[in-house]
Amino acid sequence: MEEFKRYLELDRSQQHDFVYPLIFQEYIYALAHDHGLNRSILLENIGYDNKSSLLIVKRLITHLITQMHQQNHFLFSANDSNQNPFFGHNTNLYSQMILEGFAVVVEIPFSLRLRFSLEGKEIVKSQNLRSIHSIFPFLEDKFSHLNYVLDILIPHSIHLEILVQTLRYWVKDASSLYLLRFFLHEYRNWNSLITPKKSSFSFSKRNQRLFLFLYNFHICEYESIFVFLRNQSSHLRSISSGTFLERRYFYGKIEHFLEVFTKDFQAVLWLFKDPFIHYVRYQGKSILASKGTSLLMNKWKYYLVNFWQCYFYMWSQPGRIHTNQLSKHSLDFLGYLSSVRLNPSMVRSQMLENSFLIGNTIKKFDTLVPIIPMIGSLSKAKFCNVLGHPISKPVWTDLSDSDILDQFGRIYRNLSHYHSGSSKKTSLYQIKYILRLSCARTLARKHKSTVRAFLKRLGSELLEEFFTGEEQVFSLTFPKASSTSRGLYRRRIWYLDIICINDLANHE
């Protein structure tokens, strides 16, 4: 327990108090209110070191404010004149301004912490880590060696005071915490800001920045403690904490087992002694994959539930965590169905005059596009019916022909780009067929003609021009490999420029 406390104190010792006087400066609220200005310049161009200076920050912000005035940016807007009975006269403007300024200020030390953590590491472009596709090469490399996965829905019903207390370890400024507590208690339904239901948004969308920051900070705090406990539990040693009471006897049995069979079963025992565990978080969910047994995964399942309830006071249930065997079940993950496929093969071995067959099974990470949810998304967007039959898009008939073609082509290229990591391209061909025929029917409806007559008059090549396939994009990106691009295209391709999921690709 003492080691656990020292770990937390060491991790939280990198606190930066120099930014908090900015809360009382007028220009920080002008900077926060200007949504067209890229705030990342605060961290990209300052040249921070471990002795960060308030003077440098103030000088940079003054420069940014000068740019804002030169570009005729206005601080106040007529849309901000709504009244709020809690604050009183014309307070929607002032409350939003204060909250936006507070969000900008409180993000600075944590963004600096991220920059310091990336320094010295062999990461050429850290922005590539933002890509959603950067997760899949990791899974492709690791999951083929694993057996079970926990599909976890992270609880988000966090008590407001727990958030303030968690942030208190990092922020020494008491006034900032009082201000944060004031806003959190005014908007008690802030949890709706992190749920996917758009109808539940009751606060200005501009203020999502602070609430999403608090939620992500809370999750990162939970993950840092969880990773520390996982690292501690992976070593064969006695731990006096009551949480690991059962594990202490478990380790004693393993040590005795090692003494007896250490010569014959070293490889097997090594895997049993220190099983591989990989953790990935995405969209309020996370997955915990391991090479261990189902019994071990069930222990992790109930340990996580108790960990959330006892340490963070978040109510959770075992039903929010599902245990799946990768070889038998697919994981619905970021628009893909991911699983580990077993490829059996037979090898004939010849020894002198005798020959015999040896069976061998190779595990392969498989990613597929779930076509039924995709058709459901296209049907909801009025591109086809529930059976997947293409229909026209009447609301687009007022557009010009080029705009209609551009709209359909852009949707297909985005979907094809995002799902380029699919192991099989059949689903993409079906999506292309639906969008092409829907586009043709929309154009025919606009010109009061039939699809056959319209295509006969203009030619089917008109649609092909705007539906540039991923295979053609690949050959343009890698011209030297044009001779083999067709074979390479059939493989999975992961891109490092995808930072959001297309609405049609997100089936959840």
Swiss-Prot record:
Keyword RNA-binding annotated: yes
Entry superkingdom: Eukaryota
GO cellular component term, pick one: chloroplast
InterPro entries: Domain_X (IPR024937), Maturase_MatK (IPR002866), Maturase_MatK_N (IPR024942)
Family annotation (Pfam families): Intron_maturas2 (PF01348), MatK_N (PF01824)
Compartments it resides in: Plastid, Chloroplast
Coiled coil (residue ranges): none
Keywords on record: Chloroplast, mRNA processing, Plastid, RNA-binding, tRNA processing
Keyword Lipid metabolism: no
GO biological process: mRNA processing; RNA splicing; tRNA processing
GO MF annotations, alphabetized: RNA binding
Family as reported in the entry's similarity comment: Belongs to the intron maturase 2 family. MatK subfamily.
HAMAP family (UniProt xref): MatK
Role description: Usually encoded in the trnK tRNA gene intron. Probably assists in splicing its own and other chloroplast group II introns.
The protein's name in its UniProt record: Maturase K
Gene coding for it: matK
